[in-house]
């Protein structure tokens, strides 16, 4: 099994690395062709021309675009992501502060989406052929019609502002000083045995995570229901019924194992969109993650931060797809034999 997983990973790397190179070129060139001067955004209007040129040289903007790209890629390979123009900090430090927050948010959202999606999908399958099927279909379509930022606005206004049940901004309460251990606030709170910080962090992440989950869960519901409906018509399911096995046992022990594979693929593919969707949700909830950082960098035309944040999003999407490819083969006996 280990050799199989390593073979899949190696095969994926042969595809992912060229894709990342192409994406990095596109990001870099598009940003450099924008009719803006990032240095002019931060330097004093009264600065002397030689001061402007010195600033441009410090950030490597005085060189030809191909040379800038090669220097950038070379620095990335050595762990140097460059210096932010407007934040007065290294890009590595900025990513280290914000990326863990976004990963936590995306993982919580994925967890909620799977719980809601699988529960709803099994219920939709259970009530098929009844009036309740129509109700659940209409409900899932209505949920799909609302984007994640709309769910975020609804939850903020209803749960946060009107009912005042949960906080609507930040990552934890202002009375806490988060320990700087891993960057993942939940892990750090567990390591330091700080239960109050753990609860505060959970309260702050619930609304943004639910906003992302409620936009994603209906897809899981519908795909799982369709997959189970198709699997239940297979010959081995008919044979199991003839042997007197109960429908519940057939569903849980036979149908669900095969019906979940298309759903798993959907989760992997859509996780990239879910991770990208954190950008707007983070802005709405003032959540200090990668999306929030990227928007602030765009406002300041901070090219080093923008290009590294965009590349990070691409890496996460490709990595999630790779993980799903491995899981799909591990869970599918036919593919394992091939």
Predicted regions mapped to residue ranges:
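Membrane-interface interhelical loops and short interface/amphipathic helices
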Residues: 38-82, 86, 90, 176-189
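Generic hydrophobic transmembrane alpha-helix motif, especially the helices
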Residues: 19, 140-210, 214
